[in-house]
Amino acid sequence: MKINIVKLYKYERRQIANMLFVSSIFVAFFGSMNVWFMVPIHSFYPIIAFLLGTASYLLSKTSCHPIFTESYFLLPTIAFALLGFYQNMVNSLNINAYIGTIFNALMMLFIFRYDRKLLKYISTILSKMLGGLLIISYPYFLLYIIGFPLPNVNMVFNDGFYSFSNYFLFLIEDHSLFTLIPRFQSIFLEPTYLGSITALLLMTQRGKWKRWYNISLFIGLVISFSLAGYVYLTAIVFLNLWIERKKIFIKCLSIIILLSA
């Protein structure tokens, strides 16, 4: 049995490029969502994500099967950058915010250029990662609610604006310490972040909501008590019903045309 070293090398380069880009998405995803273990690099995570994305892009260009194949990327990237600059102006942010927006826009350029089929694969990876993490954290959160002592450390973020008891698999905001059943926020700094991101991930998983990781995401969304998450979920459900209704209408119309032919 002969092994084609050239083909194997080209295949490896494509795989490495894909792994680098998945890593860049991981950094950008968890960094932008303010998870507690990304707090030490919160100020410069866009640079790390951009460097990983750049390495992936350059390596992909040397492969005979590149992973950055989409041609429609310039307009959405410019729109994203302009929106970011506008938000910075409205909030009167400093130069660091504008630099961060530039790196985020460059990262979005890579995302818009990335192969759409592979992009669905990445969304599934993120859904499985977060869904798996939530499944592990649910029993510990239940133990906390019933009063079982769990190891934790104090955590302060953003000059004291956020103050938590960090149980590693989930956070409890200090303002919620005496609440009978606090809002579940997992590893995120606010329950709203958990509600929003689980809803958006569920949107990418339309048609696969019965999978274990999507059920886990749905539970996390529900117990986050996030109004934003509930609004997103409602919009997604109505969108799904509209699409399914459209499919049924097209199928019925096709049958009518076939029978009348």
Question: What are these regions, as identified by a protein language model?
Answer:
Residues P40-L59, Y98-M107, L194-L202, Y230-F238:
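Membrane-embedded alpha-helical segments of multi-pass membrane proteins
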Residues G147-F168:
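Juxtamembrane non-transmembrane "cap" segments at the membrane-aqueous interface
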Residues T124-F148, I172-F225, V231-W242:
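Alpha-helical transmembrane segments of multi-pass inner-membrane proteins
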Residues N4-E12, V27-I41, L233-A261:
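Alpha-helical transmembrane segments and terminal signal-anchor/GPI-anchor hydrophobic tails
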Residues M1-S63, A81-Q87:
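N-terminal signal-anchor transmembrane segment
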Residues Y11-V22, T62-T77, I122-L126, W212-Y213:
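Membrane-interfacial loop-to-transmembrane alpha-helix junctions, especially the N-terminal start
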Residues G53-H65, F110-L119, T204-W209, F238-K246:
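Structural signal for the C-terminal ends of transmembrane alpha-helices
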Residues T54-L59, N88-L142:
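Transmembrane alpha-helical segments and their membrane-water interfaces
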